[in-house]
Structures are given as structure tokens and as C-alpha cells.
């Protein structure tokens, strides 16, 4: 590593003045997009703010309205807390920044980097299935490089929303579903699967909660309104915010509510990286750490969310089965996350091998999560009628107790094993006690009523049509293979430009 990224002096944990708000359903029925926009504008004006973006389709059933409003004079965090006391508001939060969860280290590609597939005993399950073209996995990330020949046959171009110019999303996608048995590159957990790249993070690997909510709503719409058979949603990113984990705080948080709207469909397992700062999921930080953790009293999200029944948090393992020193502790499960070889940007010519496939070796909980996402899709290819909750139960129920004192003593994660998950699925499928189809109904979150899902996602159609353009950033791109940048996808970056509905807005 010869260089480090330069950080913006003005960068903070959230976008200045931005608050994501979920308004209560309007009292009148039959609201239109125009009336939703008017209501958002009226609300913002009443608070001395203005509308930065709306998601009007959420109001089509009269169940609520997502919007981002901006104040030129108030701190976003204080403003959000004030808005939570407004009777019109269901949820409010600052527009926190999020980052791809890759460690600031890179290693040289070598043949042993496929160790992860053997560690989870994937080959023993490949004897039964190598995947299915009827199964989809959504990757909410930086996009997927359409030109990588080891991914192209498994990318669903109709639903994917933007190509990758950073590298993180492409690497994650390869772990899930690089095309297998084709004589080039690497193999993913699935050799046959349909990958949907949902671009929510920018060229520098960073984004905001509003960007992520856009991605979640897009995936929710594909499942609920278009019938797309998505069995896993991979979310390999993290942010540290001061939201204390509790029922009352979560139900008032827009990020949690968007995830819950996806969760209650019970169609897709939501797989989340635990984070890379040696913290504990659900526990407060004790001090400032680098540019990611502002100080004491912060929590890693989305990994610390509770009440998302179909979510699995994933820590990272070393090759010896111990927990990686960078991995956050307290995840549901741990999977290979150190020195993982996978697909990368074709534009990084120094990464392109003799067979024409760009490959790179990276470490992080970002790499651990897609092993689990890929496994959920592979298990679904064997038994397609499994619900998300049944897939989660198979994955966790079939995990192995760690033989590593480091893992057991420090965090208690079980070790993910695909073969054992498959055995659990075969043994207990149909057992209403050990593999129930639906989550329990007696929890403190059971009374949550889902909001309507969008039917016209905000900016993704523009990416697909080539009208939206690429995000641009002054923060620098992803590292890797003589890229010339330093840390890979971690840090606080300068504000970037996002294209939304052909309107360029600085966020």
C-alpha cells in the first residue's frame, strides 16, 4: 500500500441538514403522486425546511410517505429528534452515510484463495445442485461489472440497476455466483443463479441511508409487485450511528422500517455484514476509531437492528477458523472473510489473468456475507418452496460450534457450513417446530404493520436506460491491483453527486 485516501475536512457522519422522514398516512384516500409531493412540501415548509427528494409511490395505498427534507439552518440530528415528536411523523433520522465493509488491506492473488468454498463444504452440496436460473439474489452495493466474463452469464440485466466502477459489488457478486465449471476465473457458491446488482453505493464505496432505502424499496417492489423470486438480499456495508437499540427507537427509524417492509414478505433472507472495526454488534463503541467511528456511544448498523426476523448478520473468519481480528463480534454466524479471491473490475487491467477474467483477493465481513447469501440461494434451488424464515433456520440450525477459543470466548458466533445447513434442511423440512414457515408472532415487533411497497422505484430506471449517468466523487475510487488509491472502500468521503430522475442533486 503506497498511498492513503485524502479525506474531506468537512465530511461528517451524516449529510448536513438532511432528515429522512416517514409521514403518517393521509386522512384522505386516493392520493396521487402530485398530492404526495404537495403534502411533503407542505410539511417541510411548516418545519422551515424544503423537500430534497420524495418516494411518492409509497403513498399510493395511503399507508405512508417517505421523503428527505433539508434544513439550511438546523443540525440534522437535532432536527430529526424534534420531528419524532410531531404527530404527523412515524419515523425520522439523519441521512447517515454508509460504507462498503472491506478492510483497509489487500493481498496478492494466489491459488489458495479459493479456501472459503472448501471451508464451508460447498463441493459436497454441488453434487446435489449447483444452482438454478429460477433463483435470484439481489446485491445492494456499488453495482456489478457487466463486462466481467465470469459474471456476465449470471447477471440479470433486466433488473440490475447500474454497472460497477468501484469493484466492491463485483467482488461480492462473484462470491455469490461466479459462473462455475466454465474453465475460467473462479466459481461462486452458486454456479447458476440470477444476480441483480442494485447500485446504492457510489464510485468511492460510500453512500447514504437514503440511497440504501431506495435500494431496499426497489428490491421490495421486485418481490411484492413483480413476482421476482429473490431468495437472498446481500448488504455488505456498515455505518456507525448513535441510535440506541430498542423497540421504540427502531419503529421510529426510516432505515429499520424500510428493512421491515422487505422482511415481512418472508421471501428473501436479508444477509448483513457485521462490520470491520473489532466492535460488538448491538453494543456501544467506547472511543473514536479512525474516520468511521466518531466516538463513544455509537452502534454498527444495519447489523445492530433487532426485530428483522429474516436477517442474518455475518462475521469474518480466518483460514484457521478463528474470528478475524478486524471482524465485529456478536454476529449470528461467521463465514470465510480473509483473503477471498473473487471477480473484480475488468477495467483494472493489472487484475486480468491469462484467461481474461479480472480477479482480486480482498478481506472483510463484506466477503463473509455473500457466502451466506449464496448458500441461501443454493438451498432454495434444491427446495424452492422454502420461505425466508425456513432458509434462515436451516443456515443457523446447521451451523457448527467453533473449535476456536477466540471465536467462542469473544463473541459466540457459530461457524457457517453449507453441507450441514443442507443436512438440517433435509432432516427438518416440514417440521413446524424446528423449521417453521413463519417467524414467531409473540415478539415485541409482531404488531408492526408494513407500509406499501413502491411500484416505480425512484432512480433505478434511469440507470437501466443509461440516462442517469455515473456517480462522481472527490473521494477516490476503490483500491486493488495497482489502482493507485489506498484504503479500499472504507472511510469518510467527501460529498458526492447522485443522479435522481434526471435531476442532479448534491447530497
Cite the ranges covered by each PLM segment.
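Primarily auto-inhibitory N-terminal propeptides
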Residues: 7-107
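Structural recognition of the beta-strand scaffold that forms the well-ordered cores
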Residues: 19-21, 67, 91-93, 136-140, ...
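Protease zymogen maturation seam
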Residues: 56-63, 81-136, 144, 148-150, ...
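Subtilisin-like serine protease catalytic core
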Residues: 124-156, 162-211, 226-232, 307-310, ...
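Substrate-binding/access-modulating region of protease and related hydrolase catalytic domains
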Residues: 127, 132-133, 200-308, 320-322, ...
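Catalytic-core environment of secreted peptidases
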Residues: 140, 151, 187, 316-366
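C-terminal subdomain of the subtilisin-like protease fold in secreted/lumenal serine endopeptidases
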Residues: 226-237, 268, 310-313, 381-469
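A cross-kingdom C-terminal cell-surface attachment/processing module
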Residues: 485-503
Amino acid at each position: 500500500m503506497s498511498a492513503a485516501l485524502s479525506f474531506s475536512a468537512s465530511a461528517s457522519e451524516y449529510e448536513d441538514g438532511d432528515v429522512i422522514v416517514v409521514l403518517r398516512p393521509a386522512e384522505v384516500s386516493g392520493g396521487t403522486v402530485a398530492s404526495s409531493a404537495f403534502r411533503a412540501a407542505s410539511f417541510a415548509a411548516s418545519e422551515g425546511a424544503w423537500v430534497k427528494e420524495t418516494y411518492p409511490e409509497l403513498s399510493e395505498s395511503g399507508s405512508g410517505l417517505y421523503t428527505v427534507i433539508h434544513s439550511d439552518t438546523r443540525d440534522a440530528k437535532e432536527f430529526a429528534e424534534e420531528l419524532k415528536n410531531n404527530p404527523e411523523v412515524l419515523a425520522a433520522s439523519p441521512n447517515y452515510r454508509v460504507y462498503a465493509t472491506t478492510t483497509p488491506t489487500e493481498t496478492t492473488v494466489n491459488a489458495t484463495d479459493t479456501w472459503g468454498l472448501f471451508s464451508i463444504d460447498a463441493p459436497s452440496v454441488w453434487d446435489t445442485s449447483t444452482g438454478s436460473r429460477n433463483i435470484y439474489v439481489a446485491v445492494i452495493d456499488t453495482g456489478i461489472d457487466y463486462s466481467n466474463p465470469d459474471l456476465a452469464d449470471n447477471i440479470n440485466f433486466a433488473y440490475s440497476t447500474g454497472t460497477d466502477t468501484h469493484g466492491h459489488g463485483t467482488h461480492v457478486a462473484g462470491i455469490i455466483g461466479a459462473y462455475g465449471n466454465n474453465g475460467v476465473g473462479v466459481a461462486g457458491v452458486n454456479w447458476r443463479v440470477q444476480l441483480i446488482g442494485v447500485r446504492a453505493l457510489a464510485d468511492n464505496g460510500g453512500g447514504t441511508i437514503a440511497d440504501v432505502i431506495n435500494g431496499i424499496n426497489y428490491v421490495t417492489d421486485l418481490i411484492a409487485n413483480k413476482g421476482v423470486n429473490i431468495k437472498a438480499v446481500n448488504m455488505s456495508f456498515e455505518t456507525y450511528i448513535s441510535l440506541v437499540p430498542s423497540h421504540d427507537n427502531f419503529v421510529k427509524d426510516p432505515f429499520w422500517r424500510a428493512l421491515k417492509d422487505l422482511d415481512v414478505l418472508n421471501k428473501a433472507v436479508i444477509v448483513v455484514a457485521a462490520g470491520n472495526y473489532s466492535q460488538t454488534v448491538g453494543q456501544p463503541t467506547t472511543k473514536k476509531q479512525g474516520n468511521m467511528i466518531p466516538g463513544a456511544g455509537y452502534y454498527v448498523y444495519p447489523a445492530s437492528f433487532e426485530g428483522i426476523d429474516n436477517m442474518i448478520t455475518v462475521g469474518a473468519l480466518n483460514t484457521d477458523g478463528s474470528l478475524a481480528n478486524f471482524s465485529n463480534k456478536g454476529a449470528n454466524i461467521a463465514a470465510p472473510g480473509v483473503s477471498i479471491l473473487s471477480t473484480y473490475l475488468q477495467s483494472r487491467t493489472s487484475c486480468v489473468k491469462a484467461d481474461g477474467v479480472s480477479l482480486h483477493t480482498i478481506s472483510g465481513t463484506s466477503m463473509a456475507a455473500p457466502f451466506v447469501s449464496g448458500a441461501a440461494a443454493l438451498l432454495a434451488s434444491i427446495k424452492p418452496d422454502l420461505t425466508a424464515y425456513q432458509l434462515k433456520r436451516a443456515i443457523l440450525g446447521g451451523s457448527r460450534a467453533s473449535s476456536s477459543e477466540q471465536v467462542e470466548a469473544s463473541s459466540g458466533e457459530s461457524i457457517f457450513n453449507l453441507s450441514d445447513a443442507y443436512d438440517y434442511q433435509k432432516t427438518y423440512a416440514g417440521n413446524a417446530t424446528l423449521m417453521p414457515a413463519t417467524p414467531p408472532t409473540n415478539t415485541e415487533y409482531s404488531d408492526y404493520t408494513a407500509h406499501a411497497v413502491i411500484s416505480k422505484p425512484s432512480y433505478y430506471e434511469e440507470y437501466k436506460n443509461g440516462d442517469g449517468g455515473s456517480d462522481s466523487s472527490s473521494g477516490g475510487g476503490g483500491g486493488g491491483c495497482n489502482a493507485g488509491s489506498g484504503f479500499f472502500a472504507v472511510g469518510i468521503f467527501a460529498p458526492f453527486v447522485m443522479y435522481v430522475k434526471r435531476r442532479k442533486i448534491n447530497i
